[in-house]
């Protein structure tokens, strides 16, 4: 029997990357998976893959930055399922924009709208479907919410906000039997990384990945399924006494005092396979 047998799980941003991997893992563990994403074609591919593997999945269009879209999404889920047990707020965007005085206001607003406000909106309209039976909410934050990156003030602000919003929600809903936690991934091999840094086949992308091998104590980028299994822990009864927490899954980057030292330390380079 799977760890999520007879549970209904809603996952946003599940067309690709961490969300897609989590949808597949949850379905394999017995959950009925409801996927929401702005990318209809890729979202349907995720649903088809789950069904071909014997799982239960369905999808509804969702733009987390649009309140009316979120309301409609929640209404569709209520009509289809009545209640839900798990909400994984995973939808997000990222883009460099320069230093704060150079940073485009519309880019800052866009990242806040999708990443932070989107997490708030989906929680606001889907939590009512959890109040009767309780459950688990998981929010995707980032190691960038704990420590800042150059030229990414919008993303840093959004993810830092998600980490603290998670704590606020955990306090608000603990007595309703709803646990709320966040995951802070490190650098994960997803289409978002391809967009930000280049693909493995491109020189820029290859250099980025090589640098991350040095910076990351475990010596590699993470894989989407490794984040999905963290989400599975938080969604399941295995974490029944865990709420208000942020789990950092970054290969050890945040444990190091000065990760930049790894780029110039010859001994570390020699030990990096």
Curated annotation (Swiss-Prot):
What are the coiled-coil residue ranges?
none
Listed EC numbers = 1.-.-.-
User: Could you tell me which Pfam families the record lists for this protein?
Assistant: adh_short_C2
Q: Which terms are listed as keywords in the entry?
A: NAD, Oxidoreductase
Quote the catalytic residue positions: 155 (proton acceptor)
Q: Extract one GO molecular function annotation from the record.
A: oxidoreductase activity
Q: What class of enzyme is it?
A: oxidoreductase
Reading the lineage from the top rank, the first entry is Bacteria
Residues recorded as binding NAD(+), renumbered to this chain, are 10-34
Q: Which PROSITE patterns match?
A: ADH_SHORT (PS00061)
- Which residues participate in substrate binding? 142
Family the UniProt entry places it in: Belongs to the short-chain dehydrogenases/reductases (SDR) family.
Q: Which NCBIfam families match?
A: PRK07231.1 (NF005559), PRK08589.1 (NF006366)
What name goes with this protein? Uncharacterized oxidoreductase YxbG
Organism, by scientific name, is Bacillus subtilis (strain 168)
